[in-house]
């Protein structure tokens, strides 16, 4: 059964390869050169040292030697290359699944085939067992993986001593067990992979793409004195910014062959553009507040006309926080006298307040700080003087001073009001 499936798969692969172009060879049709064949054959004849061999206790207290799966795979990659061999599971069967006291016992066998890129292959059977697990799925998983790994090691063992065939020699095992084991080398941080990007692989892949697109590219690159450009990076960045459209035409094949340099150059361009944008934004933010201040408060110079200065003073006085102005009743106050009192230094504010006997008026106190003294008469008084003069003639008997409506004088008037008999 496995042989029939293997023949069917081989016929399918051969038919698919013949249907494609003859220039591209499929896996299994590559031919080793004489040097490659001789080097691989010599490497497979070597026997493994004690560093590759592990041991464990088997049933009955017997000591068994074996090779770990990851070590076998590493050895195969060294011998044949990462793309020089492949393995496949041709068949896998579950022999038994038993449930005993809530625990599962599973046995699985698998047929594994290992094939090289020239078409030669070896196939063997592996077996995996799982005992005592409470989960049926985990038992099947463990048994299947163990069967495939065992079949892979047995199939690779058929290629030579370097892949594990020497372990079957008992005399060799006795001699190897007497040899001292070498200490594993210390971890070299330089050789460890610390980032995702591999510049050598990227450069080789880029060169391969260029070579497939342009067969004569390799000769041009070899004829060039160097693959590095003669200009510095700074000049290159400025040239690319000034002439973005013609940069693709002026680049030489020597610059195109270095993918790493182009990537770094692109990063520098983007960084420089980013910093230029940030500098422009910072300059705009600095100019905007200064322009606002210049428009809000224009400087008054000696050459400024007097009319303009008067308009600025009127506007400033009009928007001043004159809270005393809102406590004045325009109907009962003579604004002409009020302006005279203000100009004389508010003498009425120094006199004791008079208690109004005519009526009591409910007022609320404003908690905003009041300005008691003014250096300039309010402009609104001058604007309202004509209208106030008309009302002062009809209400001349009921004149009041601003001190009567001042929030600082109300508390004293209320105290006097409480002391007076009703």
UniProtKB/Swiss-Prot annotation:
Molecular function (Gene Ontology), one example: DNA binding
Annotated GO CC locations: nucleus
Keywords: DNA damage, DNA recombination, DNA repair, DNA-binding, Nucleus
DNA-binding region(s) in UniProt: 153-157
Residue ranges, compositional bias (Basic and acidic residues): 1-11, 230-242
Superkingdom of the organism of origin: Eukaryota
Principal subcellular localization: nucleus
One Gene Ontology biological process: DNA recombinase assembly
Compositionally biased region (Basic residues): 357-378, 412-422
Segments of this protein annotated with the region Disordered: 1-21, 228-255, 281-306, 343-422
SUPFAM superfamilies noted in UniProt: dsRNA-binding domain-like
Stretches with biased composition (Low complexity): 12-21
Function description: Involved in double-stranded break repair. Plays a central role in genetic recombination and DNA repair by promoting the annealing of complementary single-stranded DNA and by stimulation of the RAD51 recombinase.
Family as reported in the entry's similarity comment: Belongs to the RAD52 family.
Subunit structure and binding partners: The full-length protein forms heptameric rings.
Protein name: DNA repair protein RAD52 homolog
Gene name as annotated: RAD52
């Amino acid at each position: 059964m496995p042989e029939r499936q293997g023949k069917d798969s081989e016929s399918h692969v051969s038919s698919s390869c013949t249907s494609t172009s003859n220039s591209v060879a499929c896996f299994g049709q590559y031919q080793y050169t004489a040097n490659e064949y001789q080097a691989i054959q010599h490497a497979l004849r070597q026997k493994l040292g004690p560093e590759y061999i592990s041991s464990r206790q088997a049933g009955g207290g017997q000591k068994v030697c074996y090779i770990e799966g990851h070590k076998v795979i590493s050895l195969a990659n060294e011998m044949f290359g990462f793309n020089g061999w492949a393995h496949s599971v041709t068949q896998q069967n579950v022999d038994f699944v038993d449930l005993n006291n809530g625990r599962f016992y599973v046995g699985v066998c698998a047929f594994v085939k290992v094939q090289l890129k020239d078409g030669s292959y070896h196939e063997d059977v592996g077996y995996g067992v799982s005992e005592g697990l409470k989960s049926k799925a985990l038992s099947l998983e463990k048994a299947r993986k163990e069967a495939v790994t065992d079949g892979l090691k047995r199939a690779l063992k058929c290629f030579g001593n370097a892949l594990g065939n020497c372990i079957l020699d008992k005399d060799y095992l006795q001699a190897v067990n007497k040899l001292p084991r070498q200490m594993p080398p210390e971890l070299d941080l330089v050789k460890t992979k610390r980032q995702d990007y591999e510049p050598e692989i990227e450069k080789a892949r880029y060169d391969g793409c260029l070579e497939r697109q342009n067969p004569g590219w390799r000769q041009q690159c070899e004829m060039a004195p160097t693959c590095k450009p003669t200009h510095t990076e700074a000049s290159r960045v400025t040239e690319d910014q000034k002439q973005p459209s013609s940069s693709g035409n002026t680049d030489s094949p020597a610059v195109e062959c270095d993918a790493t340099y182009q990537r770094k150059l692109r990063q520098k361009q983007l960084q420089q553009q980013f910093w230029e944008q940030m500098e422009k934004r910072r300059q705009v933010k600095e100019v905007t507040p200064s322009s606002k201040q210049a428009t809000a408060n224009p400087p008054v110079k000696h050459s400024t006309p007097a009319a303009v200065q008067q308009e600025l003073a009127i506007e400033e006085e009009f928007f001043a926080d004159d809270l005393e102005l809102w406590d004045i009743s325009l109907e009962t106050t003579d604004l002409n006298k009020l302006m005279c009192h203000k100009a004389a230094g508010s003498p009425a504010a120094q006199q004791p307040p008079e208690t109004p006997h005519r009526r009591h008026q409910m007022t609320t106190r404003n908690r905003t700080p009041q300005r008691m003294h003014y250096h300039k008469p309010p402009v609104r008084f001058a604007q309202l003087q004509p209208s106030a003069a008309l009302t002062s003639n009809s209400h001349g008997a009921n004149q009041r001073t601003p001190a009567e409506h001042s929030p600082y004088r109300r508390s004293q008037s209320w105290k006097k009001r409480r002391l007076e008999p009703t």
